[in-house]
Design a protein with these regions (language model features):
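A domain-start/cap signature at the N-terminus of enzymes
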Residues: 1-76, 148, 177-195, 270, ...
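Extracellular/periplasmic catalytic domains that process cell-envelope and extracellular macromolecules
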Residues: 53-55, 69-73, 98-103, 169, ...
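Histidine-bearing beta->alpha loop at or near hydrolase active sites
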Residues: 272-277, 287, 291-298, 310, ...
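Primary recognition of N-terminal secretory signal peptides and signal-anchoring hydrophobic helices
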Residues: 317-492
Length: 492
C-alpha cells in the first residue's frame, strides 16, 4: 500500500469560471466553497472512442495508480461529473486519484456525451421546464423512456466491460460516485443497474419526491438493494423549478434508500468538525447519510476519502447477487458520548439510544427592550430542556422544592448546582454563575438552557443549530440536515 503525497498547485484566486479549461494543461488549482481542485494528475489518461457502438464518440478518463497490481483482483470506482463539467474536471475536483494511489484501485471518469449534461430521468412535472432551451444553455438533455436506449447509461455499462477486459477487475467490487447532476446519474444507474455495483454514492443533486415515490408512498422503482451513500451540503438550494421544502427533499431521498435496503433500526451517529454522519444498517444493504456544515453546492475534497473509508472499503456484491459486508477501513460507530435534543420533541438522543423526557424541548428568546420605546430585540435564542432529564443524563441527584420552582443538584464528582424559576443565575459550588438565559417553569417542569448546562456542568462540547443541540466530548458543528434527521428520529 502506497502513501498519499499531495502535489502543490498554482492557485488562481482571481478565477470565476466554474471549470477553467486552462487547468487541463497547467498546474492551476482553484478553491471555492463548493469546489476545490488538485493539480491535473500526470497518470490520468484521456480516451475518445465509439465504445457504445452506436456511431457516437465519447470521452472518458482512466486513472491507473502506480500501486495497481495486475496479479490481484482490483476494485473499480466510477466517478461521475456534475452539469457543465467533464470527466477530467470531476477528477481534479475530487481526491479519488489520491485515495487510489494508496489503495491500488482504478478510477474511471466518463464525460457526458452531449453539452456536458447527462441523460437523466427527471420528475414528469418538471421535464418540460428543465428541458426548455435558454440563452445560458443550462437545460437538461432529452432522455428516452426506455433506459436501454439511454446513451450515457450505455456508455457506463460499456466502460465497465472495457475495464474488465483490460484490467484485473474484481467484479464484486465495482462502485460509483457522482456529484450534483452526476449524483442524479448515479442514482438512475442504481435504480436500474444496481446488480452491477456493490455501492453507490452521491453528493448534492437530490430528486423530488414524485420521482422516487408513488402516491401511496411506495417506492416508484423497485431497485435492487445496494449500499448507498448520500452527502448533502448545508447551504445547497433546491433544483430550478422545485418548490418543495428543501429539508423535505433531503428526507425523501434518505427515506427511499432506507426502504429499499430494509433499514429499520436506529442509525449510529457520529459528528466531527463540520461533518455529520449517520450509519444505517439494513436487512438487505446499508445506507450512510452525510451532511456538511457551512458548505455550498458541490462536493468536499475529502468526500472520496470518506466514501471509501466508511462505505466502499467494506462492501462487495457476492456471486449470488447479495450485498456482503467485510468491514470498513474506519469503524461506523456512534460517538462514544452524545446528547441531543430538538425543539418540539419530548424524546432525546443519548449515547445512541432514544430517551423520553418529562416535557418537550423548546426555544426561548433572550430579549432587550430597555430604551426601545416598547419595542424589543432578540439577543439570543436557546434550546431549553427539562432539568430532570439533564440531571439524569449526567448522573446527578436532583432535589426539587416548591413544585419544581427550585431544584438543587448533586453532581457525580460531589459538586452542587441550584436553579430557580425566572433566575438567569445558577448557584454552582456556592458561587453565582449567569446562564445563557433564565430558568423557565413549564407544565410543572423546570427548564434550563441545554447547551450551557452540558458545557458548564458536564464538560461536554455542545453545538447548536437553528433548533437543535448536539453535545459530545469533541469539537463539532451541528448542521441543518443532521438536525432534521434527529427530529425525524425523536418525534413521537
Amino acid at each position: 500500500m502506497s502513501k498519499i503525497v499531495l502535489r502543490p498547485g498554482d492557485p488562481n484566486d482571481a478565477n470565476r469560471d466554474y471549470l477553467p479549461e486552462a487547468i487541463k494543461t497547467s498546474q492551476m488549482v482553484v478553491n471555492e466553497n463548493g469546489n476545490n481542485s488538485q493539480p491535473m494528475p500526470p497518470r490520468l489518461k484521456e480516451f475518445h472512442e465509439d465504445i457504445v457502438g452506436d456511431g457516437l464518440k465519447d470521452y472518458w478518463y482512466e486513472y491507473v495508480p502506480e500501486s495497481y497490481d495486475p496479479a490481484k483482483p482490483t476494485p473499480l470506482v466510477f466517478s461521475i461529473h456534475g452539469g457543465l463539467m467533464t470527466g477530467w474536471g470531476q477528477c481534479i475536483y475530487t481526491s479519488w486519484t489520491y485515495v487510489a494511489d494508496r489503495e491500488g484501485f482504478i478510477c474511471v471518469f466518463p464525460s457526458a456525451h452531449a453539452r456536458r449534461f447527462w441523460q437523466i430521468m427527471c420528475e414528469p412535472e418538471l421535464k418540460e421546464v428543465l428541458s426548455a432551451k435558454n440563452p445560458e444553455d443550462i437545460y437538461l438533455n432529452d432522455f428516452p423512456e426506455d433506459i436501454r436506449e439511454n446513451h450515457d447509461a450505455n456508455l457506463i455499462l460499456a466502460l465497465l466491460e472495457r475495464m474488465k477486459r483490460n484490467y484485473n477487475i474484481d467484479e464484486g467490487r465495482v462502485y460509483m460516485q457522482g456529484m450534483s447532476l452526476g449524483n442524479a446519474m448515479t442514482q438512475m444507474m442504481a435504480r436500474f443497474y444496481a446488480h452491477k455495483f456493490a455501492a453507490m454514492a452521491g453528493s448534492a443533486g437530490p430528486a423530488r419526491k414524485t420521482l422516487l415515490f408513488k402516491a401511496d408512498g411506495t417506492p416508484e422503482f423497485q431497485s435492487l438493494p445496494v449500499d448507498a451513500w448520500q452527502a448533502r451540503m448545508e447551504l445547497d438550494q433546491p433544483a430550478p423549478a422545485c418548490s418543495d421544502d428543501y429539508e423535505d427533499v433531503i428526507a425523501y431521498n434518505r427515506d427511499y434508500w432506507l426502504k429499499i435496503n430494509g433499514c429499520t433500526a436506529l442509525p449510529r451517529i457520529r459528528l466531527f468538525g463540520e461533518n455529520g454522519l449517520a450509519f444505517f444498517h439494513g436487512e438487505k444493504a446499508d445506507y450512510v447519510f452525510r451532511d456538511v456544515k457551512n458548505r455550498d453546492h458541490g462536493q468536499t475534497f475529502d468526500d472520496a476519502e470518506l466514501v471509501w473509508d466508511y462505505c466502499f472499503s467494506g462492501v462487495r456484491r457476492g456471486a449470488d447477487g447479495t450485498i456482503v459486508h467485510t468491514g470498513t477501513a474506519l469503524p461506523t460507530e456512534n460517538d462514544t458520548v452524545s446528547v441531543a435534543c430538538v425543539a418540539g420533541c419530548r424524546r432525546a438522543w443519548v449515547n445512541g439510544e432514544i430517551r423520553s423526557m418529562a416535557g418537550e424541548a423548546f426555544l426561548w428568546q433572550k430579549l432587550k427592550y430597555h430604551g426601545l420605546q416598547g419595542n424589543q430585540i432578540v439577543r439570543g435564542e436557546y434550546l431549553m430542556a427539562p432539568l430532570s432529564f439533564l440531571a439524569e443524563t449526567v448522573g446527578a441527584a436532583l432535589d426539587a422544592e416548591d413544585g419544581n420552582r427550585s431544584c438543587a443538584l448533586t453532581l457525580p464528582g460531589g459538586g452542587t448546582a441550584q436553579f430557580a424559576q425566572g433566575s438567569i443565575g445558577a448557584v454552582v459550588d456556592d458561587r453565582i454563575v449567569s446562564m445563557d438565559c433564565e430558568a423557565v417553569l413549564r407544565e410543572g417542569e423546570l427548564y434550563v438552557p441545554m447547551a450551557w448546562f452540558l458545557r458548564n456542568l458536564a464538560g461536554l462540547q455542545a453545538s447548536c443549530s437553528r433548533d437543535g443541540v448536539y453535545a459530545t466530548d469533541h469539537e463539532t458543528r451541528l448542521s441543518t440536515h443532521i438536525t432534521r434527521l434527529l427530529r425525524d428520529l425523536l418525534k413521537d
